[in-house]
Curated annotation (Swiss-Prot):
The keyword Signal applies. The basal body constitutes a major portion of the flagellar organelle and consists of four rings (L,P,S, and M) mounted on a central rod. Assembles around the rod to form the L-ring and probably protects the motor/basal body from shearing forces during rotation. One of its GO terms (molecular function) is structural molecule activity. GO terms for cellular component: bacterial-type flagellum basal body, distal rod, P ring; outer membrane-bounded periplasmic space. It is found in: Periplasm; Bacterial flagellum basal body. GO terms for biological process: bacterial-type flagellum-dependent cell motility. This is Flagellar P-ring protein. Residues 1-16 form the signal peptide.
Length: 349
């Protein structure tokens, strides 16, 4: 975990804004799927709701197993909602991740087995079947996931090859950004291909003789100036920064329930802790050390940095001090709200 976190921080410094980062192609998007399922094999952490027992009875009845009403009373099963995102151009046999959330009073879904569950779109059609062993989320055991837990059974048809143009939709309404993207695309191709239709939509015509796939790839990977707001992407399951770790934090003071963080241009100032359980005087590595008293100071005891403090510096410091990920996220949101970082925060599970 420690090494993955360090690698993720290094990769985040290579992250730059492209057209793909701040726009979607109209018509090419994920579709949300949902289904009702049952989990079995829980070690006494399931629920005892009547509708869960009824669902199990119906399932067994469909398998020609007759169970008298009221004879099932087990905390080893749970009723759940199963959701998934069907990627654009997903094909039959593809595997996709599914997310699990309990409906009743189950305490945990960890290591439970999701029985085969139909996942439907808003049109009522079944697009995938989910099944497998669940891994509970660290911060909330009543939710979980199954990587590659669903198999795509039906495809959503979209004839991309027949298109001679695409329309970009900005994630956020901005006349400045729409105009800039129009200019960048036209400059890149050396001809008038892009036209901003409004402050959020840009129509882009495909050059003659170029495949639509190559065209989309070229357009989406055009790099944009730093005037675009950066994105901070955090993987909640791995508790790591995927992108945006190099974002500099402006001077700010954040007061939380158990600590206060002061950040200045030269580094993280002292952090006042009221938590007596923090371990002190422990060497963590060559460039990271917890001081003789529970404080954080990049210039001295904690993390040495020649540059102004970044999001990665702050997150690393808070992780070393054993703060939970929720506390770190809340702190970053407070820093954003106070204007010390101009960034969109995206949490991924």
């Amino acid at each position: 975990m420690k090494y993955f976190f360090i690698i993720a921080l290094l990769l985040s410094s290579l992250y730059s804004q492209t057209i793909k980062d701040i726009s979607n192609i109209i018509g090419i998007r994920e579709n949300q799927l949902i289904g009702y399922g049952l989990i079995v094999g829980l070690a006494g952490t399931g629920d005892k709701s009547k509708f869960t027992m009824q669902s199990l009875q119906n399932l067994l009845r469909n398998s020609y197993i007759k169970i008298p009403a009221g004879s099932i009373n087990s905390k080893n099963i749970a009723a759940v909602m199963v959701t998934a995102d069907l990627p654009p151009f997903a094909r039959q046999g593809d595997k996709i991740k599914v997310n699990i959330s309990t409906i009743g009073d189950a305490k945990s879904v960890d290591h439970g087995e999701l029985l085969i569950t139909q996942l439907k779109g808003v049109d009522g059609n079944v697009y995938a079947l989910a099944q497998g062993t669940i891994v509970a989320n660290e911060n909330n055991k009543t939710t979980g996931f199954i990587y590659d837990g669903a198999t795509v059974e039906n495809e959503i048809n979209f004839d991309l090859q027949s298109e001679d143009s695409i329309q970009l939709s900005l994630l956020k309404n901005s006349a400045k950004n729409a105009d800039l993207i129009e200019t960048k695309i036209n400059d890149t191709f050396g001809k008038k291909l892009a036209t901003a239709l409004d402050t959020r939509t840009i129509d882009v015509k495909k050059p003659d003789g170029m495949s639509i796939v190559k065209f989309i790839s070229l357009v989406q990977n055009i790099e944009l100036e730093s005037s675009f707001k950066k994105k901070l992407i955090i993987d909640m399951n791995r508790e790591s920064i995927l992108a945006g770790g190099d974002i500099v934090i402006d001077p700010v003071t954040i007061a939380r329930d158990t600590f206060t963080i002061r950040i200045n241009k030269t580094g993280l100032g002292e952090v006042d802790w009221n938590n007596p359980t923090i371990n002190t005087g422990v060497d963590i590595g060559d460039d990271v050390r917890i001081a003789d008293k529970p404080v954080i100071d990049i210039n001295n005891a904690m993390i040495n940095t020649k540059n102004p403090p970044t999001v990665a510096d702050l997150v690393r410091s808070m992780k070393v001090m054993k703060l939970p990920m929720k506390e770190i996220i809340d702190t970053l949101k407070m820093i954003k709200d106070m204007g010390a970082i101009d960034v969109d925060i995206e949490l991924r599970e």
